[in-house]
Amino acid sequence: VILERGADVDTRQADVERFWETGKLQPDSNVQFGEGGAGTFSDGKLNTLVKDKFGRNTEVLRTFVRYGADPAILYQAKPHIGTDVLSRIVKSMREEILRLGGEVHFHSQVTEILTEGGHVTGVKINAAEELPCEQLVLAPGHSARDTFSMLYENQFPMSAKPFAVGFRVEH
């Protein structure tokens, strides 16, 4: 079961286009939130980790190809798939999850993690519906500060990851 706080990628694309045209922001369906995450509307450049001696990104690239990316990304030094292709790939991945019997629920923000005796027992969705579970993978993505606040307030252990700052010089 996948719970996505934002909209599906097609609805999200329309919401993003409307934002660029009118300035009307949909809080949970925009460049940051929705199916595919913040990277869906990036320029489609892929970090290949070509110098990684463990080849950890190879399977990710193969997965992109399996769902519609150009096979050239498997050997290009600086692969690029583009936002238009990435959106189709994200949708194809969702369709495969559904075909295999999985579930994807949009506009379903995890607002509480339910526990008993120190173990996860479920989640509360949109502060209303409860979904039982024994295991939980929480992937809040970019800009989900309210999710981190909820974790902090409920004393879930967290640790900061290394922080990197970069900049681009164009000439």
Annotate the PLM regions:
Residues 1-45, 49-171:
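Residues forming the flavin
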